[in-house]
Design a protein with these regions (language model features):
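Generic non-transmembrane alpha-helical segments
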Residues: 1, 168-176
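Central regulatory/effector-binding core of bacterial HTH transcription factors
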Residues: 1-35, 186
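Residue-level signal for short, function-critical loop segments
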Residues: 13, 53, 154-156
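C-terminal regulatory
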Residues: 20, 32-148, 175-186
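A bilobed periplasmic-binding-protein/Venus flytrap-type ligand-binding module shared by bacterial periplasmic
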Residues: 148-158
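Short amphipathic alpha-helical coupling segments at ligand-binding clamshell hinges
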Residues: 157-171
Length: 186
């Protein structure tokens, strides 16, 4: 729809300084604190436990939190820049005598490890719809809701390229959530 739009996607664990133009737009898993940013809540996510069907068939399906001690947990390091609700959930999982642990520095890495059958991963709820080979583990366990915000500097309020990107992201999230509701993957 916008062939001349150039996007430089940076998957960073640090908070970029938007007013200093480290980036034009950011999608953050918490409300931005800088006063001179325009912010729009896109959605809320929950962190949950996931594994492939093949992994669970081979290693068993945990029925309670204590059963996690028999599995490798794949997660982000709790000292990383992740949001508190996700870190709190991860710390809670790790209190169950987890012997085998694989930490990765971003959720894409956690997802890749899960898809390759390395264990049970802590991931955002929206991934289930796109990966039919994974299933939710311990469905009653999840983090508190984590708000996801789109943010950009006030000075870019009237930028057509920012508006195009904002509208595209908003529409894609709406469609993804709609499909998730229709398929029951919420």
């Amino acid at each position: 729809q916008y062939p001349a739009l150039k996007i430089d996607l940076m998957l960073e664990e640090r908070v970029l300084d938007l007013p200093m133009r480290e980036a034009d737009v950011a999608i953050r898993l918490k409300e931005p604190s800088q006063a001179d940013l325009i912010r729009k809540k896109l959605m809320g996510v929950n962190m949950r436990l996931y594994a492939t069907h093949a992994y669970l068939d081979a290693h068993g399906r945990p029925e309670r939190m204590e059963d996690l001690s028999k599995h490798r947990i794949i997660c982000q390091n709790t000292n990383s820049a992740q949001v508190s609700a996700g870190a709190t959930f991860t710390q809670e999982i790790l209190t169950h005598n987890v012997d085998s642990l694989l930490t990765v520095n971003n959720y894409f890495g956690v997802l890749q490890a899960v898809l390759n059958g390395l264990g049970i991963g802590i991931l955002p709820d929206y991934i289930l719809q796109d990966f039919p080979e994974i299933e939710r583990v311990l469905p009653e366990e999840e983090s508190r809701e984590i708000p996801v915000f789109l943010a950009y500097p006030e000075e870019l309020r009237h930028s057509k390229r920012i508006a195009a990107f904002r509208d595209f992201v908003t529409e894609e999230i709406f469609e993804h959530r709609k499909q998730a509701l229709e398929s029951g993957n919420v």
